[in-house]
Curated annotation (Swiss-Prot):
Entries under Gene3D superfamilies matching the protein: Leucine Aminopeptidase, subunit E, domain 1, Zn peptidases
Major location (coarse): cytoplasm
Top-rank taxon, per record: Bacteria
GN (gene name): pepA
PROSITE patterns: CYTOSOL_AP
Keyword Hydrolase among record annotations: yes
Residues reported in the UniProt entry to bind Mn(2+) 1: D265, D342, E344
GO biological process: one example: proteolysis
Entry EC number(s): 3.4.11.1, 3.4.11.10
Cited function: Presumably involved in the processing and regular turnover of intracellular proteins. Catalyzes the removal of unsubstituted N-terminal amino acids from various peptides.
Protein name: Probable cytosol aminopeptidase
Catalytic function, reaction form: Release of an N-terminal amino acid, Xaa-|-Yaa-, in which Xaa is preferably Leu, but may be other amino acids including Pro although not Arg or Lys, and Yaa may be Pro. Amino acid amides and methyl esters are also readily hydrolyzed, but rates on arylamides are exceedingly low; Release of an N-terminal amino acid, preferentially leucine, but not glutamic or aspartic acids
Names of the cofactor(s): Mn(2+)
Lineage: Bacteria, Bacillati, Bacillota, Bacilli, Bacillales
One term under GO cellular component: cytoplasm
Amino acid sequence: MFQVQKELASHEAVIVALFEEEETSSFVQELDKAFEGQLQVLLEEKELSTKKKAISKVHSLGKTEVKRYYFVGLGKKESYTTETLRSALGKTFKTLQAAKVQDAAILLDSFVTEKLDAIDVAHIAAEVQGLGTYELQTYKSDKKDRVELEKFTAITAEDAQEIEAALTVGYVHGRATNSARTLVNMPPNVLTATKLAEYAVELAEKYDMDYKVLEKEEMEELGMGALLAVNQGSVEPPKMIALIYKGKEEWTDVIGFVGKGITYDTGGYSLKPREGMVGMKGDMGGAAAVLGAMEIIGELRPEQNVIAVIPSTDNVVSGTAFKPDDVITSMSGKTIEVLNTDAEGRLALADGITYAKKLGANYLIDVATLTGGVIVALGNHTTGAMTNNEELFEQVLEASMETDESIWQLPIFDRDKERVRNSKFADLNNSPGREGHAVMAGTFLGEFAEDTPWVHLDIAGTSESSGAHDLGPAGATGAMVRTLATLVERFGEE
């Protein structure tokens, strides 16, 4: 699909950057020769817009071998960022998709500044081409034909091999994010814990990873009472899924991802209202993020050891379901007083974290659609983070900045630990109250990470979008897939 060339050839469409600046760029000046000065006229008349994310289409009318040009406004160079580029190109690729373009090129060097080099631009362009044109996988009987971009050429004076490598990495990041999106969008009667486990096994076998899928009996033997409690009301069997990627000869410095895999959450006996229940098929967004990251890792083969653990079940009401006031025993041996059955994700993750440690994880990152409280605190564009290790958190933060997936650190104080440890009947309680809800959930998980360096990522606000945006349609976003993979790719770098 991807090609790298030094000069333009015949294409259906070519993408060119336009910045707000006094002098027209050399790229536009060169094109303007073929247009006999008409591009400059269009700029002066403001029919070619340089404003951020503005897209101006110009037909060549036979003056060049290119059928039409798409000029992408990027605003002022001093305010140009990777986020600006991602949004602008996402919108551009949506436009090309709507026009059914199958052969496109990008004047890569026209997007290069002191802040962004050609490798950055190539990576982002390939990544965003997949993200921006993603479509929901629906179950409608009347399916529309989809025209795909079949050929994408980067025009650049830079080293072709380096640009090709960046295009490949970007493409893999975008495709895996879309894989996670598709999982989150699947209905809960289709994506059960069993189906999620089957998907994970197929992924592991495709990329020659080791894997384990624990059944209920094995969980009972290991004492996974927290996950099993959540599963008590369900006819669907629970699964504890583990994928093991060995990127080094020695099994050291192992990064452990733990993704919440609640395939549907009714709230249990702490029942959600109807409006709060619809959409809870997405409560396995953390599991999807982890599997998306493992897809990238499998494709790119970084020299790093990684474990992915997914505790999976649904949380439903029945005569056998767990109840408020129950006391359960987790795999760690710590007992938990259940005050809220709708705080089930942290129970499943507690056993997932302990299991990841048992498998050898030296670092832990859990990802979960965990609390509505994080949405109240941070909105729908920022993931909440908590940690017991600032050095590990800084690496996660740097990865998130590289991928433009915003995260913000929330605190854990001793008084927060006291609240989750406040129980007359058990070591911990799973829901101390509404105040500081997001912080309480993360603090609870920290009790199971213990001294292992750990970062908690609450993606309840960022896992799904209520409306279409530059990088995709309404629905699942694939939040944190690219950040997790980038963390592994960059882990330990100075």
